[in-house]
Amino acid sequence: MPAAQPAGDSLAGRVVGTRVFGFSQGERAGRRDDFVRAVLRGALEAQYRSGMGRADYVDLLTAGSMPEACRLPQRYRADWLESYVSRLLGRDLREFSRLSDPRRLRSLLAGLAAAQGSETVVARLGGAVNLSASTTTSYMELLRALHLVERLPPWTPNLLKREVGRSKYLLTDSALAMRLTRTSPDILKDLVRGGALGGLLEAFVAAELMRQSTWCEERFTISHYRSPDGREIDLILELDDGRVIAVEVKAASSASAADARHLRWLEGRIGDRLVAGVVFTTDDRSRHLGGRLWAVPVAALWELG
C-alpha cells in the first residue's frame, strides 16, 4: 500500500494573502491615496477643486490600470489587451481548470463588462452564452482567480441578519472593460451618446477603493446596498468599528439634492454610524449637500488622500 502523501505546508502565521490589482491613480501619480483616511480627518469640509472634467475621466478609463498597457498609445493598447485576455484564458487558465471553455469564458467576461455597475443576475448572464447557472457561477469564480473580476457583495446593516440581494461582479480594469465591449472613448465623452459612462465610472471608483483598501490606515469592507423597497446605494464602505461611508457615483457634471436622496435616507436610518455620504461626479469642485452629505469630484479619491 503506497504511503500517504504529506499535506502541503499551509504557511499559517508566516504568509499574508492579498488580492492583486493594477495600479491605482495615486500610484500612477506617485502620491499616497487613502480616501477613507481623508474623510475621517474632515477633508470633505474644506472647499476642494480639481482641474478634471468628463473628457479627462474618460481618458483615465481608457488608459486602465495595467502598467504595460497604460504607457501604450490607444491603438497598440487595444492589441495588448486582446493578447492579454487570449493568453490568460487560453493558457494560464489551464492551471486552474481543464474543464472550462475559453471562448465561453471570454463571452461571459464581455457580458460582465457590459453590465458594470449592475447587480449580476447569474441565470440571465449564463443563459446568454448557453451556460447553466451553476457553471456560470463556477466560471465567475475562475475569472476572480485570474484577477480579472471582483465580487461586490450586498450590504447587510445588521450582522445578525443574513446577506440579502445579489452581488455585483465588476472588471477592475476599465480599459479591459471598454475593449471587451468595443466602447469608444469619443462616444463616452459625448453627453448625448455616452450613457455607458455611468456604469464604467461606478466600477472605476469601486476598483480604486478596492486598491486603497489593501494599504489604507483604517480597514474597511466594500459592498453595495439595495433596500427591500428598492432604494439603491452604489457603495458602502464599512469600517471595523461599524461606521459607514456611503457612496453614489454619477457621470453628471453636478449633483442635485435628488442625487443624494438615498444617502439622506440612510443617514436617517443609521444616524451617527454614517461618517459621510459622498456623491462622486465629473464636476471640478466640491459642494456641501447638507448634513453629512457632500458632492465631490471623482479625483478626490486620490487627490484628497
Please annotate each region the language model reported.
Residues 4-114, 118-119:
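Interdomain motor-coupling "hinge/lid" segment immediately C-terminal to the ATP-binding subdomain
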Residues 70-244:
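Accessory nucleic acid-recognition modules appended to NTPase machines
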Residues 226, 280-281:
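Short beta-strand/turn micro-motifs composed of small residues
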Residues 245-254:
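Active-site ExK catalytic segment of metal-dependent nucleases
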